[in-house]
Amino acid sequence: MPGEPVTPPLFDDKGKSVMARITPDDVGRYVILSVHDPLGYEQDVAEVIAGYMDEARLIADTHMFVTYTGTYHGVPITVCSTGSGAPETEIAMVEFFRFSNADTFIRAGTSGTYLEDIDVGDLVIAAGAVRDEGTSAAYVVPTYPAIANHEVMLAMAEAAHALQIPYHVGITRSTDSCQAGQGRPVLDYLQEDSARIPEYWKKVGIKNFERETSIIYVLCSLFGFRGGAVNAVVNSTPKGNLEVGAGSDSVFRTVLEGIRILAEWDAIKERTGVDFLLPSMIAKRP
């Protein structure tokens, strides 16, 4: 009828996702999302992370997304590599929302920093994210916060601490632009506002900057899932250095160990019949 809303068809191929080619039987409860990132890894990052698992099998390679499912200390985990930025991450997440029973999504990636006290190779566990990307605005107003699930964030911090890996917890800035939008001149050109980006975000204490965390946090909060992010710092503005691959091993070990810890906590919640993890439930008794 004239005037009725018209929507495009959903990406669905007889019960299987079109972009990632996954089904519910293929996917574990915990999903690691990572980017095909030349600043971190020479081979596909899903294959790299799968190599850290006890066992893993290739679910699908669609050129856009590569997906493996395996176990780590008995915990079923799926890892999916995506293209860079919020739009590509959105596509992957919506496919997992619709075609799996996963409820926990954790970014394992790379980032930069404007702060002197964070070194290249350190990890940043994002408690929240600045939404300086456009994709999340398609879902909800700009004042809606992008925040981590507290259980995921604590599990990642617990893992990094146990592994004795240098880490920081704080706010990440997610951008669309990897160049001018992060304060990098292009052929000696930079708008005045862009030139002030490093100093401004340094002043307000943003720990790091990248391109994906905010969309993960917004989508997870909006649709009732758990989101987290652990990013290695591979470039430092104040120190003027970039180190390809810095901290990648630390990120992968932290995220996998963090998921193992989170699975233990989830089991405690299930046994006690509570919805949210409380400190008293995991406190070590003397």
Model-identified regions with their sequence ranges:
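N-terminal short beta-loop-beta anion/metal-coordinating cradle
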Residues: 1-90
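Glycine-rich phosphate- or other oxyanion-binding loops that anchor nucleotides, phosphorylated ligands
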Residues: 60-286
